Design a protein with these regions (language model features):
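Alpha-helical transmembrane segments of multi-pass small-molecule/ion transporters
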Residues: 1-310
């Protein structure tokens, strides 16, 4: 029950951040299109800082085992759910924004502060495992779908700052190399902005929309159902039958972290990707806002369901 309450509080905080972005545009201080600069800062600066900082922990056999369990669970989620969501997209004729909003969760913005508040800072590393796996899919699958590119540009993918930060973080962890305290503290400070910055972008975009159009669009409610109910239930079944929780003494906690990452609202980075590559960023932002609001109810319920079945 404590986790469920903290979940609701964290999501409510994110929604207030969206409101701040909304108000700064409505007050005439900024325009909704000004959010594009902040989107690029989140994608190419803040998220890499989160990843590098998370991997600055001591190398121990227990940590490695936990990382492997978290990685296996994260990869299982990403691969199986990709096929499932793609199938749903064909059946229900989902467009690029809808498919990516259903598939990609807002783990980068919500999971780190949530895990820190509920489980402690020492567990943030395992939440970043899911983020890292999702980032690989994000900069391959999501980028291709949103940008409408015919094929993958592997050179751009490999040289992407987010992908580089994942490999550098892993390398530093396994070699035991620790960054100077000044550098690591700087990474932590910049990385802590990921939630507020992403939510402010969403709010700024939301301010430029027609509310009646948003809430009259029945597609948004269907996408919200898929993102917050259908996908979490599929993930719950997968995690239950995989028995990955039995592979480590901390297995149940590791599975909880991965499940929390899966059941978050639609990724605000989809909105930012749409901005960068000229897709429908306002529709993506509307989905993000509606799913964030609805997740105040759905996330605690899903966590309670997980605790009942594991």
């Amino acid at each position: 029950m404590t986790i469920s309450i903290l979940l609701a509080q964290q999501i409510a905080q994110l929604f207030l951040m969206i409101l701040m972005g909304f108000l700064i545009v409505k007050a005439g201080l900024l325009k909704d299109e000004d959010s594009k600069v902040l989107s690029k800062i989140v994608l190419y600066l803040i998220i890499p800082c989160v990843i590098l900082n998370a991997f600055q922990v001591d190398y121990t056999p227990e940590t490695v085992r936990g990382l492997l369990v978290a990685f296996a669970a994260s990869l299982l989620m990403q691969v199986v759910l990709l096929f499932a969501v793609s199938a749903l997209g064909r059946v229900f004729h989902l467009d690029a924004v809808e498919i990516t909003s259903v598939y990609y969760s807002n783990s980068g913005n919500l999971i780190v502060p949530l895990v820190t508040a509920v489980l402690g800072a020492e567990w943030v590393l395992y939440s970043c495992v899911y983020m890292s796996v999702q980032l690989v899919f994000f900069w391959t699958h999501c980028k291709k779908v949103i940008s409408r590119e015919a094929s993958y540009d592997w050179k751009k993918i490999v040289l992407n700052l987010n992908i580089i930060s994942i490999f550098v973080g892993i390398l530093l962890f396994f070699t035991g190399i620790r960054l100077p305290a000044l550098v690591n503290n700087t990474l932590h400070s910049v990385g802590s902005m990921v939630g507020p910055a992403s939510m402010i972008v969403t709010g700024m975009l939301f301010a430029g929309m027609d509310f009646r159009q948003i809430f009259a669009n029945k597609r948004i409610y269907f996408v919200t159902f898929l993102r917050l109910i259908a996908v979490p239930l599929m993930a719950l079944v997968l995690l239950k039958i995989s028995h990955l929780a039995d592979l480590s003494a901390d297995g149940p906690t590791l599975i909880l972290i991965v499940f929390l990452a899966v059941i978050t609202p639609s990724a605000s980075t989809v909105t930012q990707m749409c901005q960068v590559y000229g897709n429908d960023s306002r529709y993506a932002s509307a989905i993000n806002v509606v799913t964030t609001l609805a997740s105040i109810v759905t996330m605690p319920l899903m966590v309670m369901l997980l605790q009942m079945v594991l």
